[in-house]
């Protein structure tokens, strides 16, 4: 059992504003989110192990859960592996996030804020799929040298019917990410390919919520270099039909309202 209760102060000033404000650090704005984590691990012999991990994030000022409807919103996964590779099944984050379990930003030291500060942290301004249910993931376990990671989720929507019809499957949100890279003593690099098929589950009356959205394709090129104290990192990002900026599908707040997004088949193209 492990966990943390973290809070702090930070100064925030919007560009063009006359004054800034001093605020308490909230969820995603600290080096680690306040959380409780339960981990169990069993040695199977011959270098193999298996286990389970449950993690819940909460607000330290009120004690309330971060996500309504989830007892363990951050992680609820089973894993099995050895010294070379690990496989996970359940609910977990994708690869382009700040935290556990398979963050490529963390692996390459590319997230210098160690949090999700708005406008600064890469996980908050480029594609990341959020926490994924019904996910399968893998990661090689080498501490240095070549690494490979991947994750796939067939959707976490609770809308629509429970029958596994072809339409139900095709209308659920699907996410896949694949990454490979190299970590050395000083230089660390990685490339991440991301795919998202936006969900289009029917409303209760049988109608669709809007136009069918085109699939998102995105690529991150990531690198960092440690000079033995000071370090520098950089990320090049390109995407086609992006529907989210960070973990939230909130493109409507950027391009001029929900009607614009709902009636469009194409998302943003970024470079």
State each model region's role.
Residues 14-17, 115-118, 156, 251-258:
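Flexible, solvent-exposed coil segments and beta strand-coil junctions
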Residues 15, 29, 42, 86, ...:
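Glutamate identity and glutamate-enriched acidic tracts
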Residues 19-20, 68-71, 105-110, 207-209, ...:
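Flexible, surface-exposed loop regions and adjacent strand-edge segments
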Residues 9-19, 58-64, 95-99, 156-162, ...:
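Gram-negative outer-membrane beta-barrel proteins
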Residues 1-11, 23-157, 172, 181-188:
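Outer membrane beta-barrel
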Residues 171-173, 177-271:
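Detector for outer-membrane/organellar transmembrane beta-barrel domains
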Residues 23-27, 61-67, 122-129, 160-169, ...:
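Outer-membrane beta-barrel domain signature
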């Amino acid at each position: 059992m492990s966990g943390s209760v973290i809070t702090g102060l930070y100064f925030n000033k919007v560009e063009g504003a006359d004054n800034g404000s001093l605020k308490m650090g909230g969820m995603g704005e600290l080096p680690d989110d306040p959380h409780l984590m339960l981990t169990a691990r069993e040695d199977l012999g011959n270098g193999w192990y298996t286990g389970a991990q449950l993690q819940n994030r909460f607000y330290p000022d009120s004690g309330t859960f971060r996500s309504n409807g989830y007892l363990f919103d951050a992680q609820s996964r089973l894993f099995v592996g050895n010294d070379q590779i690990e496989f996970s099944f359940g609910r977990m984050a994708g690869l382009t996030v700040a935290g556990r379990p398979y963050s490529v930003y963390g692996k390459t030291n590319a997230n210098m804020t160690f949090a999700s500060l708005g406008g600064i942290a890469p996980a908050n301004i480029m594609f990341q799929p959020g926490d994924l249910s019904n996910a399968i993931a893998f990661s090689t376990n080498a501490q240095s040298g070549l690494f490979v990671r991947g994750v796939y989720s067939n959707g976490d929507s609770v809308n629509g019917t429970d029958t596994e019809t072809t339409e139900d499957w095709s209308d659920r949100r699907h996410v896949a990410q694949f990454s490979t890279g190299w970590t050395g003593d000083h230089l660390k690099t990685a490339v991440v390919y991301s795919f998202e098929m936006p969900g289009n589950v029917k409303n209760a009356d049988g109608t669709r919520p809007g136009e069918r959205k085109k699939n998102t394709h995105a690529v991150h090129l990531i690198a960092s270099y440690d000079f033995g104290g000071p370090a520098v990192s950089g990320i090049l990002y390109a995407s086609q039909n992006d529907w989210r900026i960070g973990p939230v599908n909130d493109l409507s707040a950027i391009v001029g309202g929900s009607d614009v997004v709902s009636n469009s088949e194409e998302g943003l193209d970024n470079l």
